[in-house]
Each structure stands twice: as structure tokens, then as C-alpha cells.
């Protein structure tokens, strides 16, 4: 059908205990239901937490084609995303977070760009970052249009990433075959697993384009989220450790496999 994009949306879930989980989740799913161009499937990779399982089994997903997989190992965002991608039945995939929302025209725009630019293997949205109160906090992925960061306007390349690290893969639509060719997100990385993934793709000459339209809304530093824990929670990273993970990403993108990386505090 003309109004369907052959894409699987991958949604990893750890727990249903975060504050306002039900409300966030409903808004996230509604953003999929309201798409002008429909998706092929929603792939949910969730833990066996009792309340979460009950919530998902009783939730009304409307007309969405939903595949649910129980993750029985220790919860891990990167591993759950990779598992979802492996089980996706579409040519394209997109990583989603339960507290985020797609704009209603995002997949319509992607479908249009896929037809116009067949050599592009990944499309980034302009991301609107908001705080937990919904107040505007900034944009992400817009740096591909800044002449001081790139000579190829609208494209994310390897040189740009070495100068600027703030790019977001949630909401991005990319070919499933990229994971098969170059490896998935690396679970051994703290903080910079997204950055390392993008470095690896661009190092391998994958063409990544930013569509100059707002495509995704992301809640920045939601209490209890991965990056909130690194900054404010029980896994606070020191400045030295932050630097370590950035430097490690710049060394490990040569390797497709998820090698063991350990930070050792300086005495």
C-alpha cells in the first residue's frame, strides 16, 4: 500500500514503575497511531516484570501490528534494541522510547526521502528536546545544517562526529541490514553507545541524512532514565569517566563486535 512504510519500530521496556509511565506510554503509542504514513510493525522487547506484562497484555494498541518478546536476561537498553532489530520483519527499523513521541508526518517524510535518495541508508529527524514539564529545552541533530560543523549540509559524516557528539538515534530510521553488516549497539558502553554506533556507521561510509523537519519529541533527562542516572542518580559518572567513554568510542568504532570495556578510576 502507498501509505505504509516498510519499517519496524523497536520499543525496549525495562519496567512500568517510572512516574507517569501509563501516560507517557499512551502518548507514545498514539503518536504511532496518528502517523500519516503507517508503519509495518511495532516490536516490543520487554522484561517479565509482572505489572509490565499485565499492562502490555491489557493495553489497546488499536490497528498497530504488534510483536511482543519477553527479555529474560538482565535488562539492558542496547541488548534489547539489538534483539528487537534481529526479530524485525521489515527492511527499515527505528528505535523508540516509551516517553517519546513521533511527529505525525515523520514516517511520511521518510518514505518520500527513501524514494528520492535511494543511496541513503539512514535518516535522522530533527529532535525537539523538552523537560518533564513539556517545556522546550533545545534541538538535537540540527548540527548537520551548521556550516561550521560540516561541509556537506544535511549529512552526518565521520569528521563532524569527531568535532561534535550530540546526536540522537532514537527516532532515526535506518536499514536493518546495517546491523547485520556492521554490528548493533554495544551494551558494554556507558554513556556513549549511541555516539560509538554513529562513528562506526560513518567510518564504514554509511550515508546518513537529516530530514529538515521536526520528526521526534524527546524528554531530556527524565528522572530515572539512563542518562539521568549517569548525571543525578545512583550511577553518577565523574568527569574523568565521561571523558573515558568518549575516548573509548573514538577507539572502538573500528570493531563491529561488542568488546569488553572497563573504566578504572584514577587514584
Language model regions located:
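Conserved donor NDP-sugar-binding/catalytic core segment of glycosyltransferases
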Residues: 105-139
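Short beta-strand/loop segment that forms part of the nucleotide-sugar
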Residues: 40-49, 70-73
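Short aromatic/hydrophobic "clamp" motif used to bind/position activated sugar donors
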Residues: 93
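Glycine-rich, basic loop-to-helix element that forms the pyrophosphate-binding segment
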Residues: 72-88
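Nucleotide-sugar-dependent glycosyltransferase catalytic core
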Residues: 135-141, 189-190, 203-207, 211-243
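Short, acidic, metal-binding catalytic loop of nucleotide-sugar glycosyltransferases
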Residues: 27-39
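Acidic donor-binding loop at a coil-to-helix junction in glycosyltransferase catalytic cores
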Residues: 190-197
Amino acid at each position: 500500500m502507498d501509505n505504509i512504510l516498510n519499517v519496524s519500530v523497536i520499543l525496549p521496556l525495562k519496567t512500568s514503575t517510572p512516574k507517569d509511565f501509563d501516560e507517557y506510554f499512551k502518548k507514545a503509542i498514539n503518536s504511532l497511531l496518528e502517523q500519516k504514513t503507517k508503519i509495518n510493525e511495532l516490536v516490543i522487547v520487554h522484561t517479565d516484570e509482572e505489572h509490565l506484562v499485565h499492562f502490555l497484555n491489557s493495553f489497546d494498541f488499536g490497528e498497530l501490528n504488534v510483536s511482543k518478546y519477553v527479555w529474560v536476561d538482565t535488562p539492558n537498553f542496547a541488548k534489547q534494541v539489538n534483539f528487537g532489530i534481529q526479530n524485525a520483519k521489515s527492511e527499515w527499523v527505528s528505535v523508540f522510547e516509551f516517553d517519546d513521541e513521533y511527529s505525525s508526518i515523520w514516517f511520511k517524510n521518510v518514505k518520500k526521502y527513501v524514494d528520492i535518495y535511494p543511496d541513503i541508508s539512514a535518516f535522522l529527524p530533527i529532535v525537539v528536546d523538552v523537560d518533564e514539564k513539556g517545556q522546550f529545552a533545545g534541538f538535537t541533530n540540527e548540527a548537520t545544517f551548521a556550516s561550521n560543523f560540516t561541509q556537506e549540509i544535511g549529512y552526518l559524516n565521520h569528521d563532524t562526529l569527531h568535532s561534535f557528539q550530540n546526536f540522537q538515534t532514537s527516532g532515526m530510521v535506518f536499514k536493518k541490514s546495517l546491523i547485520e553488516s556492521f554490528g548493533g549497539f554495544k551494551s558494554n558502553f556507558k554513556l556513549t553507545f549511541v555516539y560509538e554506533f554513529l562513528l562506526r556507521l560513518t567510518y564504514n561510509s554509511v550515508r546518513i541524512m537529516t530530514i529538515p523537519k521536526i520528526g521526534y519529541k524527546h524528554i531530556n533527562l527524565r528522572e530515572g532514565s539512563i542518562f539521568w542516572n549517569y548525571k543525578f542518580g545512583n550511577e553518577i559518572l565523574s568527569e574523568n569517566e565521561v571523558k573515558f567513554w568518549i575516548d573509548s568510542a573514538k577507539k572502538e568504532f573500528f570493531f563491529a563486535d561488542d568488546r569488553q570495556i572497563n573504566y578504572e578510576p584514577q587514584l
